[in-house]
């Protein structure tokens, strides 16, 4: 009934298996990839006809993590998987980016790739397994895909690169300082297609070495996919790239002069208007048949690309007049918004971000329910890209895939310089509002985020800056690497290469290639040119702010204290009675974790001190021989009980009240009376023994034995 094909190799410390022919047989391509005990099913389907008027390539990649894969039941009211999580969205983008450039140019049929996590061993991250499965499924599907590709994750510890580090190793690099890198690389046999990383100030050489290490590591996986395809791939789909050379020639003849003049305008808004006018001129010169040609958009783009790309490679001058390695003018401002905790306006040419930092407490941490466990994050970065930032009227709604991806890129860049939670016990939320955009808005978020956090008083290890690089690679092998690319250069170029870091090293790197890959030599030159740009931007940022500022009066203050874990119950009290009383009396917010770390938060320093003192009085142990002020809470025949140390009571025996014989303690004491007592010690049962007669009740000074009156 089944025509199964299964291939396996030893990859790293695990066995990687690809199998097809048993599940989802009606899909064009279906592969289950298994690494260790982590399994992902990838299914590929594609339309056999192009939709009329389709002028772009409609590739959609979905990645789903099923809770059953880790033996879990989803939370929430409905108890089922709902909209994609941030991890699922980011992984879908991770898979999409290296696949998209490898479809035959001109193919515009709809393609759907669905990756479903079926089993998770809590050791191997499913994202790389999903990428391998998707590539294998496309390779055997018959779709016009010029793959395969494969992906690998690389760590860096003690100067050694590590292939496929575990989920726990990569969970939070801030908590694992020995592990300095989380790098994902995807590529073909000959070239790297995509890079994504979070790093802890790695040098350019170390980062390039990691990319080369990953590219070498994926070669056996590529051979495995090819081996699978040789046994079971479907017949290639009958598709020939459309020949629209005559249409391209007509478009060029009709408007090359106008288009070239439009691209000579440096101002974005004026250039956009001029380009639109040039397109209208071209349309007016074309026949009705040419206007209806579905390849007209591609012909237009080809003309624009040839003008922009050719001028840069031949003359070294870009459309805004800059040299290839020149950064646009930068203006940095901080402290713009009076009621926020920290704010910055970062402007680089026609790209601008208003970035705001808010400091919160432990209650504000983000709770993340992942397949490999539940955890909290005390650093949040949200990126917003409204339509007005590019002068358009468009949809406004929840963040899309692009906004989530750009926000995560900026998060990775800044994560490496945050102080440890034990040193800075705040939840930090950074929001980047992109107010203008003409290329590299995610890197503006990195620069603005660094400025904003320093303005809020966050003690960063070092400022961080980011720059977006571009590449124009011509067919004859000539190329130009561009620093701080514009939107048009991104749109019409061959590479989007974003690098962020401190003066000491790289903290984040992301690379997307629109062609069949670049060589290590080009990547090395791009990294060196990016470093020069990054150092320049850091210098411009330093003119505005160089370190953490004083806290805003509107920001909460947080004091931390460590108590013995066996005292946690006493601080909380029965049903939370004690801690509620502390909060009500002091006015501060109090948070206790299972390790006995207490965070006391309030904008009011007096409230923090009050809560701190109340907690200290509960958990601290009274010292023998010390004098305390207490209150008589109960009188009995043999003495009086005095509350003297927070909630602690001790007995003053009748013989220790005064230096004379008393008939009854009530002769000199009454309930509610304030007295001074000395802690004599503890009896055999641990009960506290106190004395009043050795303390001057007015001054609180201890009475020396020779000063004490005789009985």
Curated annotation (Swiss-Prot):
<dbReference type="InterPro" id="IPR015848">
    <property type="entry name" value="PNPase_PH_RNA-bd_bac/org-type"/>
</dbReference>
<dbReference type="GO" id="GO:0006402">
    <property type="term" value="P:mRNA catabolic process"/>
</dbReference>
<dbReference type="Pfam" id="PF00013">
    <property type="entry name" value="KH_1"/>
</dbReference>
<dbReference type="InterPro" id="IPR004087">
    <property type="entry name" value="KH_dom"/>
</dbReference>
<dbReference type="Pfam" id="PF01138">
    <property type="entry name" value="RNase_PH"/>
</dbReference>
<dbReference type="GO" id="GO:0006396">
    <property type="term" value="P:RNA processing"/>
</dbReference>
<dbReference type="InterPro" id="IPR004088">
    <property type="entry name" value="KH_dom_type_1"/>
</dbReference>
<dbReference type="Pfam" id="PF03725">
    <property type="entry name" value="RNase_PH_C"/>
</dbReference>
<dbReference type="InterPro" id="IPR012340">
    <property type="entry name" value="NA-bd_OB-fold"/>
</dbReference>
<keyword id="KW-0808">Transferase</keyword>
<dbReference type="GO" id="GO:0004654">
    <property type="term" value="F:polyribonucleotide nucleotidyltransferase activity"/>
</dbReference>
<dbReference type="InterPro" id="IPR036345">
    <property type="entry name" value="ExoRNase_PH_dom2_sf"/>
</dbReference>
<dbReference type="InterPro" id="IPR012162">
    <property type="entry name" value="PNPase"/>
</dbReference>
<dbReference type="GO" id="GO:0000175">
    <property type="term" value="F:3'-5'-RNA exonuclease activity"/>
</dbReference>
<dbReference type="InterPro" id="IPR015847">
    <property type="entry name" value="ExoRNase_PH_dom2"/>
</dbReference>
<keyword id="KW-0479">Metal-binding</keyword>
<dbReference type="GO" id="GO:0000287">
    <property type="term" value="F:magnesium ion binding"/>
</dbReference>
<feature type="domain" description="KH">
    <location>
        <begin position="556"/>
        <end position="615"/>
    </location>
</feature>
<comment type="function">
    <text>Involved in mRNA degradation. Catalyzes the phosphorolysis of single-stranded polyribonucleotides processively in the 3'- to 5'-direction.</text>
</comment>
<dbReference type="InterPro" id="IPR036456">
    <property type="entry name" value="PNPase_PH_RNA-bd_sf"/>
</dbReference>
<dbReference type="InterPro" id="IPR036612">
    <property type="entry name" value="KH_dom_type_1_sf"/>
</dbReference>
<feature type="binding site">
    <location>
        <position position="490"/>
    </location>
    <ligand>
        <name>Mg(2+)</name>
    </ligand>
</feature>
<keyword id="KW-0548">Nucleotidyltransferase</keyword>
<dbReference type="InterPro" id="IPR027408">
    <property type="entry name" value="PNPase/RNase_PH_dom_sf"/>
</dbReference>
<dbReference type="InterPro" id="IPR020568">
    <property type="entry name" value="Ribosomal_Su5_D2-typ_SF"/>
</dbReference>
<feature type="domain" description="S1 motif">
    <location>
        <begin position="625"/>
        <end position="693"/>
    </location>
</feature>
<dbReference type="InterPro" id="IPR001247">
    <property type="entry name" value="ExoRNase_PH_dom1"/>
</dbReference>
<keyword id="KW-0963">Cytoplasm</keyword>
<feature type="binding site">
    <location>
        <position position="496"/>
    </location>
    <ligand>
        <name>Mg(2+)</name>
    </ligand>
</feature>
<keyword id="KW-0694">RNA-binding</keyword>
<dbReference type="Pfam" id="PF03726">
    <property type="entry name" value="PNPase"/>
</dbReference>
<protein>
    <recommendedName>
        <fullName>Polyribonucleotide nucleotidyltransferase</fullName>
        <ecNumber>2.7.7.8</ecNumber>
    </recommendedName>
</protein>
<comment type="similarity">
    <text>Belongs to the polyribonucleotide nucleotidyltransferase family.</text>
</comment>
<keyword id="KW-0460">Magnesium</keyword>
<dbReference type="GO" id="GO:0005829">
    <property type="term" value="C:cytosol"/>
</dbReference>
<dbReference type="InterPro" id="IPR003029">
    <property type="entry name" value="S1_domain"/>
</dbReference>
<dbReference type="GO" id="GO:0003723">
    <property type="term" value="F:RNA binding"/>
</dbReference>
<dbReference type="Pfam" id="PF00575">
    <property type="entry name" value="S1"/>
</dbReference>
